Amino acid sequence: MVFPLPDKYIDLLTDFGFKRVFGTEPNKALLIDFLNTLLPPHHHLKDVTFKNPEFLGNTLVDRRAIFDIYCQSETGERFIVEMQKAKQNLFSLGARSLGRETRPGSHRKDRSVYYSTFPIQEQAEQGFWNYELTAVYTVGVLDFVFDDHKHDSELLHVVELKNQHCEVFYDKLKFIYVELPKFTKSLDELESHFDKWLFLFKHLAQLNEPPLPLQDDVFAQLFDVAEIANFSSREQALYQDSLKVYRDMYNVTQTLIDETLEQGIEQGIKQGIEQGRAEGRQEEKQQIAKQMKAAGLRAQDIAQYTGLSIDEIDGL
């Protein structure tokens, strides 16, 4: 059943909102405009072609990869674009608070590097091939801050391969991350087109009408696409489901972060940090899964975010 929503516009941080605005053919001008605020001038986009976002491994045992958005420019560059949420960064925080060795943010960075290998492999040609590649960009809009960036005010990070002299070794593989929580400008403080996009990522759902600083043509299209009243009944239902998952996951994550930090401090004082490693991690996942079930999330969603199997989740 679809219930009326108080918001006029969708939340771009939901899975439905992000893919509707940036991942559909009629709205690709919005994706192009946003990406061009991040890309170097020589790779600015005029057009993109959306590609299948699902990649299967080369063998039955290989993991598959499913991107939020995968597209290719008219000159061959490939772009993975993802909305990356804090909930998917949760386990590295829990492990550290219990004293287990882990590199800050390594889980998320490892995943980005792993994903980038698929567009590279896709370019291989049968028969004779000179190994010439077109550029691959992985763009992550982050709803969290990397742990090793918490004391850094810079919110835009462009990463590429460099040698020991900080000289670019290879310029066809780039990772671009935008840490949204660090963006705190008000409407009156917006200076650049990039600022305007970040403001909309964070505040679109709170607006009742397009404000004066956001009257550009591209944003007029965005406000039209994002207006919930323009959705079909099915689209409204899909958005409400997506919004519920986003809000439930956010609440569960915040609760678990608070509990994990409190437990870590208490355990560190009373016992030292000597917890069982594999067993402790499994118990963490099960506890998270239980809270997700209590919040009404589907087993498939819980499996995606915890790594537990459907059978394990059903047995909790």
Pin down the residues of each PLM region.
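Conserved single-residue anchors adjacent to enzymatic active/cofactor-binding motifs
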Residues: 1-98, 103-236
